[in-house]
Structure formats: structure tokens, C-alpha cells
């Protein structure tokens, strides 16, 4: 129990293994590198969004505008390519727009002190409206093969974009756990006042979280355009909720200061894995949100129960030394049960 709570991403990993085992038992052909590669390819967009959402949530904030940012940046790379710009320039253009969108969210939250949920609900509509105004509501089609080729498998079923996603996961996880600036995210989310007293650049850290979140949303938009080959006018709609759900499933606390990027990665992979269940059982696509929501609620309820049990255990250990006959404090003797008072 204590291991699961200290390593929150472990629960997501165990859930992935359990679901994978069930699927293999139902269909042995599911056990293959091709299947894993397919699931990973399908999860890349959600993984990128979960990484960004995790950074924001670690600082005790939330961003519900990333779906619109994905659409806006996918439009940006598509329009730039169709206007004759090279692929690197087009991708940098999309990344710049994502960074600006994220920084604007950060300015509203950090600079103007607007609650994050309110500020990003506003920019959710703002960025979606900017996307539709830019294109006149039309789809962006005819994207060049140079962009589409980035999603084609090259090694072990993994595409160049997939390798870039894995690199971002690893470098992000290392940065958060091994560097001072990475640990600042945890300090800000855990105790804002204490972080200020310790000299942490609180406002800069929160601004950085929102800005990186916007850039990762831009990366997700590039991956979307590459995988699909065109950009519909509703690109990214609803992805913000899935990103938050993936983080929660992976052990990122909504109260800030707890979780890892590996957990966010595993949560996104697990949610994508649920889609394969629908295909295997030939269920309609609209079951996806229902099943994902059901799983999320189950994880939250289980996590809450485990936390309560651990809290009771720690409280018993704390006060056990005050009980007669327990000098060392190691042996926990339960307190006598109180009789229920009659009203």
C-alpha cells in the first residue's frame, strides 16, 4: 500500500499490464511489437498533452485550453507548408505560436492573478475562434509528404516523431527529478509560501510551466497534422480533458506538488489502450469516453481509500508511543473503540 502511494505511477503501470494481460488472453495475436507500436503511435498526441498538463498541475494550476492550442498550431504548420515554407520553418512557426499561447495563459494567471480554470476557459474559446477565423472554417488539406513521412515507422515500429516523444519524456523526467529548476515545480505546488521563503522564483516557474505546456501542445498539433495528413476545423476538441485524466491516472495530484512525467506518460498510454478494447470487442466508438470516465472514477476512489488507510496508519504510529507498554513506539496498539453516543 505504502509503495503504491509513494510511487503513484506504479498503479498506472500495473493497470496497463493487467489490461494487456486480459487482451492477450482474449486474443493471443495482441502480443506483438506491431500492436505495441500501434498503441504508442495512437497515444503520442495525448502523451505530449499529458506532459504539459503535468507541469502545470505540479504548480497547482490547470490549463483547459490546450485542445484549442493543438488545433491552432496544427493549422499554423499546415498553412505555412501550403504557402511554400520549409518543414523546419513551419514547425518552428507552430512552436512559436504554442509558446505565445502558453505564455499568454501564464500572464493571465501569474500576472493578472486570474484563477487558472477561469483564464484558460476564456482562452479555450479565444484560440478556437482564432483558428476558425484564420481558416474561415475550412479544413487544411494537401499537406506535403515531407510532413507525413515523419509519422512512418523506421525502427521497431516507432516513427521519427515517436522517437522525439520518447526523448521528451525521458529528458523531462530527468530534469524534474535531477535538477534544481525541475524541483522548483514541486516546491511551488507543494507550498507556495515556503517556496518563496526558500528563494524559489515562483512566478517564473509558473510562467515556464504554462509556456512549456503551450509548446508541447504545438508539438501535439504537428504530430496530429503528420499522422492524419490534413487538419479539420475541430482539431483538438476535447483533448484537454483527456490530458488531465491521463495525469490523474498517472498519479499527478490536482493539488500540486506530487507526481512524475513517467506517470503522465503511463496514464496517457493506458487511456489509449482502452481504445483497443473497443476494437477488440467491436464496441461503438462512443463507448470510449464512458469507459475512460468509469476507469478514472475507479482509480480516484481507490486512491482516496488508500490515502485514508495510510493516513490512519501513520496517525496510529505517531501516537502509539503515548500508549502504556509501548516504549519504543514501533509496536502499534490500537486505541480502544469508543462507544457510540446516544443522541
Swiss-Prot record:
Keyword Transmembrane included in the entry's annotation: yes
Family statement drawn from the similarity comment of this UniProt entry: Belongs to the binding-protein-dependent transport system permease family. AraH/RbsC subfamily.
Function: Part of the ABC transporter complex LsrABCD involved in autoinducer 2 (AI-2) import. Probably responsible for the translocation of the substrate across the membrane.
Segments traversing the membrane: 13-33, 38-58, 61-81, 92-112, 114-134, 154-174, 212-232, 251-271, 283-303
Record bears the keyword Transmembrane: yes
NCBIfam families for this protein: PRK15432.1
One cellular component (GO) term of this entry: plasma membrane
Protein name: Autoinducer 2 import system permease protein LsrC
Subcellular location: Cell inner membrane
Amino acid at each position: 500500500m505504502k509503495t503504491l502511494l509513494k510511487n503513484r505511477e506504479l498503479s498506472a503501470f500495473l493497470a496497463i499490464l493487467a489490461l494487456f494481460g486480459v487482451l492477450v488472453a482474449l486474443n493471443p495475436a495482441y502480443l506483438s511489437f506491431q500492436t505495441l507500436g500501434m498503441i504508442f503511435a495512437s497515444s503520442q498526441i495525448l502523451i505530449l498533452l499529458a506532459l504539459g498538463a503535468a507541469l502545470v498541475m505540479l504548480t497547482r494550476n490547470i490549463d483547459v485550453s490546450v485542445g484549442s492550442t493543438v488545433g491552432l498550431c496544427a493549422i499554423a504548420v499546415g498553412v505555412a507548408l501550403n504557402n511554400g515554407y520549409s518543414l523546419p520553418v513551419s514547425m518552428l512557426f507552430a512552436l512559436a505560436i504554442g509558446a505565445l499561447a502558453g505564455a499568454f495563459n501564464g500572464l493571465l494567471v501569474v500576472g493578472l492573478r486570474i484563477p487558472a480554470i477561469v483564464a484558460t476557459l476564456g482562452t479555450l474559446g479565444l484560440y478556437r475562434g482564432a483558428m476558425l477565423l484564420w481558416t474561415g472554417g475550412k479544413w487544411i488539406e494537401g499537406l506535403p509528404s515531407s510532413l507525413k513521412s515523419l509519422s512512418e515507422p523506421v525502427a521497431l515500429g516507432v516513427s521519427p516523431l515517436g522517437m522525439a516523444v520518447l526523448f521528451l519524456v525521458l529528458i523531462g523526467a530527468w530534469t524534474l527529478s535531477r535538477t534544481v529548476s525541475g524541483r522548483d515545480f514541486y516546491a511551488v505546488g507543494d507550498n507556495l509560501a515556503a517556496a518563496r521563503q526558500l528563494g524559489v522564483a515562483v512566478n517564473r516557474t509558473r510562467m515556464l510551466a504554462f509556456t512549456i505546456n503551450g509548446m508541447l501542445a504545438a508539438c501535439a498539433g504537428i504530430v496530429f497534422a503528420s499522422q492524419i495528413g490534413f487538419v479539420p476545423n475541430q482539431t483538438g476538441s476535447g483533448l484537454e480533458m483527456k490530458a488531465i485524466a491521463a495525469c490523474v491516472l498517472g498519479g499527478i495530484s490536482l493539488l500540486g506538488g506530487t507526481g512524475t512525467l513517467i506517470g503522465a506518460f503511463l496514464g496517457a498510454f493506458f487511456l489509449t489502450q482502452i481504445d483497443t478494447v473497443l476494437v477488440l470487442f467491436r464496441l461503438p466508438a462512443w463507448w470510449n469516453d464512458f469507459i475512460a470516465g468509469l476507469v478514472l472514477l475507479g482509480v480516484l476512489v481507490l486512491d482516496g481509500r488508500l490515502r485514508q488507510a495510510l493516513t490512519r496508519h501513520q496517525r496510529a504510529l505517531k501516537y502509539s508511543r503515548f500508549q502504556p507498554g509501548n516504549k519504543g513506539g514501533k509496536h502499534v496498539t490500537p486505541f480502544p473503540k469508543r462507544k457510540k453516543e446516544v443522541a
